[in-house]
C-alpha cells in the first residue's frame, strides 16, 4: 500500500499515458483507483475530530467531501473517469417516489407535492453557491427515458395505443434527445478579436495593468488587449478617456477578453457567452447565440411529445373520461397498481410540462421583444424596464425593431451579425 501511495502522489507527466485505472486528481497529481482509501488527510482530520467529540472544521469537511467525490471513478480506456454523485439521487429517488405515490391517492398527493418543492429547494441551494451540478440534467434525461420506458411496458400492452401513435411518441423522444445534443455543443463563447490586441510583449514582471501570467516562476508571452484606445485613432479630445472607461467596464478579468454588446460572463460556467440569455440548469449549460434556436426546438419537441403522451396514457387508463377532465377525475384508477402507476406518471409529466410551458412562453415573449432573459433581469434590477402581464413581458426598448424583424433576427443571427459596439453589462 505504501508503494501505491507513493505512486499515487507523484506529479503527472503529460507525455505518459494513463492506464484504465489511473487518473489526474484535483491537485494535478497522478493517482490510482486502488489508492482511493489512502492518503486523505482531510478525512482523517474529520474522523479524529468526530472521535474526540470536537467541533468540525467546515473547510476540512468540504475538502474531505471534495476528495471523496474526486476519487469516485470508473475504469476507462484513456484513464479513470470521475462519477458525479449528483447523478445518483435522480436514478434512485424518482422511481421510488413514483411507485410510492401509486400505492394510494393520499400518498400520491404528498409525493407529487414534495418532489417539486425538493427540486426547487435544491435549485436555490446550488444557484446561491454558483456551482455546476448534473442533478437537473440527470433528472431531466432520466425522467424522459423512464416515462418512455413505462409507456412501453405499462401502457402499450393494454392495446389502446396504435402503431402510428407509438411511432409518433418514439420520434418525439428521439428528436428531443437530438436537439438536446445539438444544444449541448456550446452557447458560443467570446473570443479575443485581432482588433482588440495591439502588441505581444514578454514580461519579466507582472505589469500593473495586466493580470499575472507567471506559472511556477516562469515567464510567459502574453497578448495585451486594447483596453485603452489611443487618441490618434480618433483625433478628438476626450475620446481617449471615454474609450478607456468603456473598455475597462467591458473587460472581463476572468476570461481576459473585452465583451461585445449583449454578451455576458456566466459565473457558473466561468466563461463569457455571446448574446447570453441565461444559464439553464436543465441542460447544465448556458443558452447563448450559438444554441438558442436549438434550445427552443428542444423545449418545443419535448412539450409536444409530453402532451401527446399524457393524452394517450389518460385515454388508456381512464377510457370513460375525457382527456381534459381525466387528470382530475378518474374513478377506480387506484384499483389496479398498474393503472395507478400510469396515472401517477401522467400527473408527474403534467407538472414538468407546466413548468416548461412557462419557460417556453417566456422565451417566445422575449424573442418577440428582442430581449434576453439576462437583459430583462438587469433592466428590472436597474428599474429601467416596463413590466406587463404580471411580469411575463419585460420591455427594455433597446433592441426591439418590431415583431417580424425581431423574429427574423433571431432565426438568422450569427456571430458576424452581432453588433460590435460595447455596452456596460453585469455578471449573472
UniProtKB/Swiss-Prot annotation:
Subcellular location: Golgi apparatus membrane; Golgi apparatus, trans-Golgi network membrane
Domain DHHC positions: 250-300
GO terms of molecular function: protein-cysteine S-palmitoyltransferase activity
Active site residues per record: 280
Lipoprotein keyword on record: yes
Biological process according to GO: protein localization to plasma membrane; protein targeting to membrane
Parts of the chain on the Cytoplasmic side: 1-82, 126-132, 182-294, 372-428
GO CC, one annotated term: Golgi apparatus
Topology relative to the membrane: Multi-pass membrane protein
Bilayer-spanning residue ranges: 83-99, 106-125, 133-153, 161-181, 295-315, 351-371
Entry's family note: Belongs to the DHHC palmitoyltransferase family.
Domain notes for this protein: The DHHC domain is required for palmitoyltransferase activity.
Name assigned to this protein: Palmitoyltransferase ZDHHC23-B
Organism: Danio rerio
Protein's gene: zdhhc23b
